[in-house]
Regions:
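Beta-hairpin "wing" of winged helix-turn-helix
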Residues: 78-88, 95
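A generic structural-conservation signal
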Residues: 58, 86-87, 121
Length: 123
């Protein structure tokens, strides 16, 4: 029994919570994603990519940043699994990954800054 191994007995049972607690690796994955979103420009780029698929050049103009800076943010977001890319000839297009994780982060960003998605206001 886990309770018998705790330093203090406060009359509560935590066996259930400990049994279903995510692994240390899962918490580290979440921490790594939060690190990726610790930059305001990166959050803005991710938010835009949740609403459109764009190339580096166009997105650079949209956020008024250099192409190398946007490419750096793309690399970080891609390594976190939040965006994906596809090649069409010489052009590479980026968009938010179609994953529960990316959708949840998108909604979290919107909730935290209290803005409405263009697609949600049209419905």
């Amino acid at each position: 029994m886990i309770q018998n191994h705790l330093p203090h007995d406060h009359g509560q049972t935590i066996e259930h919570e400990l049994e279903y607690m995510p692994s240390v690796e899962n918490f580290q994955t979440v921490a790594d994603i939060f690190k990726q979103l610790g930059d305001g420009s990166r959050i803005r780029i991710f938010w835009l990519l949740c609403h459109c698929e764009e190339c580096v050049i166009n997105l650079s103009a949209m956020v008024d940043m250099s192409s190398p800076a946007v490419s750096h943010h793309f690399k970080q977001l891609k390594s976190a699994g939040l965006i994906v890319s596809r090649r069409d000839g010489k052009e590479v297009y980026y968009k938010a990954a179609d994953t529960e994780q990316a959708r949840n982060f998108h909604h979290m960003i919107e909730w935290l800054v209290k803005i409405a998605c263009p697609s949600q206001t049209e419905e």
